[in-house]
Amino acid sequence: MTINRLLAFSLLLVATLHCSFVHAGEGAFGWIYTLDLQPKGKVEFEQRLQLNQQQAAGTYDALTARTELEYGLTNDLQVAGYINSYYTSANQNYTNPEACGDSPTCTGGYGVPSSHDPSTAYKKSGIEGGSLEAIYRITNPVTSPVGVGLYLEPTWGRNKDELEARLLLQSNFIDDRLILAGNVVVANERLKFIENGNVPESMLDFLVGASYRFAPKWSAGVEARFHNDYSELNLRNQVQRATFIGPNMHYAAKDWWVTGAWRYQLAGGTCMGGGEAECSNARVWDSHSVNEFIVKVGFPLN
């Protein structure tokens, strides 16, 4: 599967399903989960495309596609299932001597196997795997000063298995036109594409953002990610720290919605604890990049 086929398949799914949709959902942020859940018995289709682009040098393009169905089990409990696919293209994108040795550049990064010749380009695409998701809303931001929810997502994939949990926080202001939201994200992972195919990692992220509805159907805002990576499970031995920030834009029509967002990695990221090979130019690499773009489209099915 090439990147063009991946995009074409996603667009075909969106176009085909759009013909039968008669209502609209909301997803105002790019990466932050909110507490706007599907009501009991409602189903929504969502397609996400994320592109991570540009590392220390050369070229690095990592596209991930997530095709999702969400279902409201109750008014406060939503479940979902994903099919995940990917496209990775890397060529001389690393510059750190700990990764490249005597060569000024080499090919590396998330998805590039340890067995790959770092002097040559790498390109691969395919179905990554699947995910399940559950969100439980404890308090509703529409009726309470602060909305609180819990999120759990196991993922099984070709490149990694992961168990991710989130604490979801949200407050609405100015007749719900202004949304402030935050996620505390904790994840344990096992990477399959490097070393023996069973490499543990963990992650702690803080996501914060704001979105303001400035016109009918239109919202815009900003979101930030404060990222921490660890080389062992359960947040032991920190190896990365980085900060990302950027704008988002959201449009909601009667029978569909779309959100686009961009995050830029600020200079000042650091690597430590044996993870120094993943850093250069005051930024962290691995699965990260200078620019991260995301587009999400949603259509309720009933």
Please place each PLM-identified region on the residue numbering.
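Bacterial N-terminal signal peptides that target proteins for export
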Residues: M1-F9
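Transmembrane beta-barrel domains of Gram-negative outer membranes and organellar outer membranes
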Residues: H23-L207, S211-N302
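Bacterial N-terminal signal peptides
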Residues: A8-H18
